[in-house]
């Protein structure tokens, strides 16, 4: 390795997945320092985002997390993490290779599945307001704030108040934002009035709709229509830089009559997407090509209900194929399909050892973890270091044995 110029090593390493680079740190001190260099980490992330290489799909099964490489899509691998195993650990978002993990509103973490670095967030109490009897639904979101170069977690806690609200639709919320750079929580005092109408039982409890969708330096949630309430579908966004709530305007063609449409949101090609489901018969997919510019909404494709599914209640695009001729769709939290944009045909992915029911999250391969690991998880990090040391020793002993046998073979000859 010493005979290869470091600029060439740098170029080679930029093309490798993060999991491989973690192992390459043991090659030499120069390699270790290069791979840990913040400029290299940033360049590696930039290349992955530009090329679409080394993407993986994270699957949340009933009790475990799994990953599958987008380039192969042949079988799943277990994702080991230090949060409680065999429990209700949820994945509530992804940003630049990091994912948000939740066991409870006070047991949260940011985790990099490629490097297995984790940062467990310091617990933040939930303070019940006056007149509140119980804590209700909790919304989460994870995103990168490019303005402050910081990763942030948003937690919105709904409170149920004993009142004469016959519809039971309006609730107060406690909104807190965690800064990874500061390693601290901050309460948002000014909360938009529309947030009080955000939660709807029959909508948000299904298909992970309570987890914020990241696009344009903001997290987004749908405020859905509901029976008995004069309200249209809305998209609520939380600006991670300003730490303020705003409303995202729909395309005019949709806004004029959106009462009978079920709406979902997602991200495709880095752009905010709106999925309009018409009576579970077909879904129009709109893309906001220039963020927060209403006129940039463009209908990019329509998906008819597949004959092979009984229900078409949820559909979400995840990623384009590299030739842009197909798009990977998640259907009803039960299957992944490639949708051909020209022929309009679907092909179901057959993934070995895949759970029968799951939620999917697109994750890039990166070396990012701004907090440099979890200070409260020393035991796990020591175990990982010991494991890496054992593997390195085995490789070293194997090399010595091979060298010995090679020399002995030459002596015999």
UniProtKB/Swiss-Prot annotation:
Expressed in seedling, root, stem, leaves, inflorescence and silique, especially in veins and trichomes. InterPro entries: F-box-assoc_dom_typ1 (IPR006527), F-box-assoc_interact_dom (IPR017451), F-box-like_dom_sf (IPR036047), F-box_dom (IPR001810), SCF_F-box_component (IPR050796). Pathway: Protein modification; protein ubiquitination. Keywords: Cytoplasm, Hypersensitive response, Nucleus, Plant defense, Ubl conjugation pathway. Transmembrane segments: none annotated. It holds the Pfam family FBA_1. Signal peptide: none annotated. One of its GO terms (cellular component) is cytoplasm. It is found in: Cytoplasm; Nucleus. GO terms for biological process: negative regulation of defense response; negative regulation of protein catabolic process; plant-type hypersensitive response; protein ubiquitination. Residues 1-48 form the F-box domain. Disruption phenotype: Temperature dependent; normal at high temperature (above 28 degrees Celsius), but in colder temperature, dwarf morphology, constitutive resistance to the bacterial pathogen Pseudomonas syringae, and induction of defense-response gene expression such as PR-30. The F-box is necessary for the interaction with ASK proteins. Component of SCF(ASK-cullin-F-box) E3 ubiquitin ligase complexes, which may mediate the ubiquitination and subsequent proteasomal degradation of target proteins. Regulates negatively both salicylic acid (SA)-dependent and SA-independent defense signaling. PANTHER family: BNACNNG10540D PROTEIN, F-BOX PROTEIN CPR30-LIKE. Part of a SCF (ASK-cullin-F-box) protein ligase complex. Interacts with SKP1A/ASK1, SPK1B/ASK2, ASK9, ASK10, ASK11, ASK13, ASK14, ASK16, ASK17, ASK18 and ASK19. Interacts with TRAF1B. This is F-box protein CPR1. It comes from Arabidopsis thaliana.
């Amino acid at each position: 390795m010493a005979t290869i110029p470091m600029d060439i090593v740098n170029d080679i390493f930029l093309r490798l997945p993060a999991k491989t680079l973690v192992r390459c740190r043991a090659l030499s001190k120069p390699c270790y320092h290069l791979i840990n260099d913040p400029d290299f980490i940033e360049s590696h992330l930039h290349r992955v985002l530009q090329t679409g290489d080394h993407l993986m799909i994270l699957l949340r099964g009933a009790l475990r997390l799994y990953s599958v490489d987008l380039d192969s899509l042949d079988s799943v691998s277990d994702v080991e993490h230090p949060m409680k195993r065999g429990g209700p650990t949820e994945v509530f978002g992804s940003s630049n290779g990091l994912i948000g993990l939740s066991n409870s509103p006070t047991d949260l973490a940011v985790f990099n599945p490629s490097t297995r670095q984790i940062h467990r967030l310091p617990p933040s109490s939930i303070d019940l307001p006056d007149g509140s009897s119980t804590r209700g639904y909790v919304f989460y979101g994870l995103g990168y704030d490019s303005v402050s170069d910081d990763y942030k977690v948003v937690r919105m806690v709904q409170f149920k108040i004993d009142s004469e609200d016959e519809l039971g639709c309006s609730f107060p919320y406690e909104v807190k934002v965690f800064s990874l750079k500061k390693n601290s929580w901050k309460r948002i005092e000014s909360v938009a009035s529309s947030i009080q109408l955000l939660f709807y039982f029959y909508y948000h409890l299904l298909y992970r709709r309570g987890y914020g969708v990241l696009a344009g330096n903001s997290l987004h949630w749908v405020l859905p229509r509901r029976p008995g309430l004069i309200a249209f579908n809305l998209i609520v966004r939380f600006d991670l830089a300003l730490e303020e709530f705003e409303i995202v305007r729909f395309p005019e063609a949709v806004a004029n009559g959106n009462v009978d449409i079920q709406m979902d949101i997602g991200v495709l090609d880095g752009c905010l997407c709106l999925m309009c489901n018409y009576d579970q018969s077909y879904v129009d997919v709109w893309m906001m090509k220039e963020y927060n510019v209403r006129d940039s909404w463009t209908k990019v494709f329509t998906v008819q209900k597949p004959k092979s599914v009984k229900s078409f209640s949820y559909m979400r695009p995840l990623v384009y194929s590299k030739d842009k001729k197909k798009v990977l769709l998640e259907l009803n939290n039960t299957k992944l399909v490639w949708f051909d944009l020209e022929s309009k045909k679907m092909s179901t992915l057959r993934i070995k050892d895949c759970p029968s029911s799951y939620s999917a999250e697109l994750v890039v391969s990166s070396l990012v973890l701004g907090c440099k690991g979890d200070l409260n998880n020393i035991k796990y990090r020591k175990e990982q270091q010991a494991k890496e040391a054992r593997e390195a020793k085995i490789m070293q002993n194997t090399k010595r044995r091979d060298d010995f046998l090679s020399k002995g073979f030459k002596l015999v000859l």
